[in-house]
Design a protein with these regions (language model features):
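Basic, amphipathic "hinge/linker" alpha-helix immediately C-terminal to the N-terminal HTH DNA-binding motif
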Residues: 19, 72-95
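Canonical helix-turn-helix DNA-binding module
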Residues: 39-71, 75
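N-terminal helix-turn-helix DNA-binding core of bacterial DNA-binding proteins
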Residues: 8-49
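N-terminal intrinsically disordered/low-complexity leader segments
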Residues: 1-7
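Amphipathic alpha-helical dimerization/coiled-coil segments
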Residues: 90-112
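Short, contiguous, well-ordered secondary-structure segments
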Residues: 4, 14-17, 29, 64-67, ...
């Protein structure tokens, strides 16, 4: 689902890019784990459909946040890595983590 805020607000414009469900978690995974193959990301988010993962990665690529690197191996392989622009989001995710630690509760053991 693409949302178009068409506003002058930079927060709204940023949400156009990273505000879809799963996108921040994909970025978090790339920040923590470094370059990842599509299959690695699928395993990290088993409840996300492959189509959704593909769409989110393409959006991040289109905006220069993630780069898809391909290798001439047999079989061919590719991985996804943050660009400089993507790495600039590290402090944003760090701030979200700190806020979450302060203001949210972890799930109870039976819900985890």
């Amino acid at each position: 689902m693409t949302v178009d805020y068409t506003q002058f607000c930079p927060v709204a414009r940023t949400l156009d890019i990273v505000g879809d469900r799963w996108t921040i978690l994909i970025l978090r995974d790339l920040i923590i784990e470094g370059p990842r193959k599509f299959q690695d990301l699928q395993r990290a988010f088993p409840r996300m459909s492959p189509n959704t993962l593909s769409t989110r990665l393409k959006t991040l690529e289109e905006h220069g946040i993630v780069e898809r690197r391909t290798y001439a191996d047999h079989p061919p392989r590719a991985d996804y890595v943050l660009t400089d622009k993507g790495r600039e989001l590290r402090p944003v995710l760090r701030t979200l983590r700190v806020w979450g630690e302060k203001h949210t509760k972890p799930p109870s053991p039976q819900r985890a």
